[in-house]
Design a protein with these regions (language model features):
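Small-aliphatic-rich amphipathic alpha-helix that forms the alpha element of a beta-alpha
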Residues: 83-109, 126-137, 214-226, 234, ...
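A generic local secondary-structure boundary/capping motif
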Residues: 47-50, 58-61, 96-100, 132, ...
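Glycine-rich anion-binding loops of enzyme active sites
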Residues: 63-80, 85-88, 104-200, 342-343
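Short pre-catalytic strand/loop immediately N-terminal to key active-site residues, enriched for Gly-Thr
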Residues: 84, 204-211, 229-230, 300-304
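Glycine-/charge-enriched secondary-structure boundary and capping motifs
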Residues: 1-20, 31-34, 46, 116-141, ...
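Active-site glycine-rich loop that binds ribose-phosphate moieties when present
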Residues: 158-168, 202-224, 297
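Acidic-glycine-rich active-site phosphate/pyrophosphate-binding loop
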Residues: 59-70, 213-219, 285-295
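N-terminal glycine-rich phosphate/pyrophosphate-binding loops that anchor nucleotide-derived ligands
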Residues: 2-100, 175-181, 185, 330-336, ...
Length: 354
């Protein structure tokens, strides 16, 4: 028996086992829209406050006059190679949809698909522990789940939350004159592309993990503010895609100020060097006709604005007089990069960036 025979096989990088990663592996918005058009329209349920009609973040079902259930699911393939971090990021991303509806999570179920004969069991266990650690931080149990043997690693959660029916925040309720506030910096997709190309240094990796594992807990408090009209989170369709959902839902124009957008460090330089995800182009192809980019924006603007965010920030549409309270709510929970990025105005359902 040779020495080579005794050498255990190398554990593959998680990102090498998937064709996409994080929210960048979502079905392209144009394809998804076409698929949903072919689905059977759902029956009418009077207590279903939020369903599939407006591309919102989660379903909401009213139990009584005082309480409604928020239900969502989110899972994806690895965006990083560290299994514990992958679990943390996926869980944080899944819980975000509950917060984006103004809800408070109460429990989660794990959704697990793993190539059992490829990954060591300890690697898979570390992914699960990562997700459990985030749920513990959110104060909820992982109360069960489902697992399959799959070709690519997949992990996420089905998350359940509660909200008062009067505090449900939809992505279709913005008003003309509302100010847009973004909770987290942008550029996660770019950094994940750099990681896959072995171009991301330790500092870049640390900032990517820090932002993607920060729970969007201010959502429930924001929903209680009287001046907050609409709420969503920025994920796989990029800032433009999710801002356009606000605009379409309200039949308004969203104006975004490019110079006010917060970016993660080095993302503009990466894009200038051609480092970004394929999802960016798919996003633009799906909704670019409803976006106006002003002349004079930097050449990297389109790729950055369509960059898919994994576990991205909350996007708030609020009355001007509520801006200080919204920013204070973010700051109190450590969202130091939260920023005013634009406003909603009368006009066609589109996004204007200047």
């Amino acid at each position: 028996m040779t020495e080579a025979t005794l050498t255990p096989p190398a554990v593959p990088r998680l990102t090498s086992l998937s064709h996409g990663g994080g929210c960048g592996c979502k079905i392209a918005p144009g394809v998804l829209s076409e698929l949903l058009k072919r689905a059977t329209p759902p029956a009418l349920f009077p207590d279903l406050l939020v369903g599939t009609e407006s591309s919102d973040d989660a379903a909401v079902y009213r139990l009584n006059d005082e309480q409604a259930i928020v239900a969502t699911t989110d899972f994806f393939m690895p965006i990083v190679d560290d299994p514990f971090d992958f679990g943390r990021i996926a869980a944080t991303n899944a819980l975000s949809d509950v917060y984006a509806m103004g809800g408070k999570p109460i429990l989660a179920l794990a959704l697990v698909g793993m190539p059992i004969n490829v990954l060591p069991h300890e690697t898979i266990a570390a992914i699960l522990r990562g997700g459990e650690s985030v749920c513990a931080e959110a104060g909820i149990p992982v109360a069960g789940g489902h697992s399959i043997d799959s070709v690519e690693p997949i992990y996420g959660l089905a998350a359940i939350g509660v909200v008062h029916p009067s505090r449900v925040k939809r992505n279709a309720a913005a008003r003309a004159g509302d100010v847009l506030v973004l909770g987290k910096p942008l550029g996660v997709g770019v950094l994940s592309a750099a990681l896959k190309k072995n171009q991301l240094d330790a500092a870049g990796y640390a900032q990517m993990v820090a932002t993607t594992t920060k729970l969007n807990r201010p959502g429930a408090e924001l929903a209680a503010l009287p001046g907050v009209h609409a709420l969503t989170d920025v994920t796989g369709f990029g800032l433009l895609g999710h801002t356009l959902e606000l605009a379409r839902g309200a039949n308004l124009t969203a104006r975004v100020h490019y110079a006010s957008l917060p970016w993660l460090a080095a993302v503009e330089a990466f894009v200038a060097d051609g480092v970004f995800t394929g999802a960016s182009g798919r996003n633009w192809a799906a909704y670019g006709t409803d976006v106006r980019l002003a002349a004079g924006l930097p050449p990297v603007a389109q790729a950055l604005l369509t960059d898919p965010q994994t576990s991205g920030g909350l996007l708030v549409a609020c009355a001007p007089e509520a801006v200080d309270d919204v920013l204070a709510c973010f700051r109190a929970d450590g969202f130091d990069r939260a920023a005013v990025i634009g406003e909603m105005v009368d006009g066609p359902s589109r996004v204007d960036v200047a």
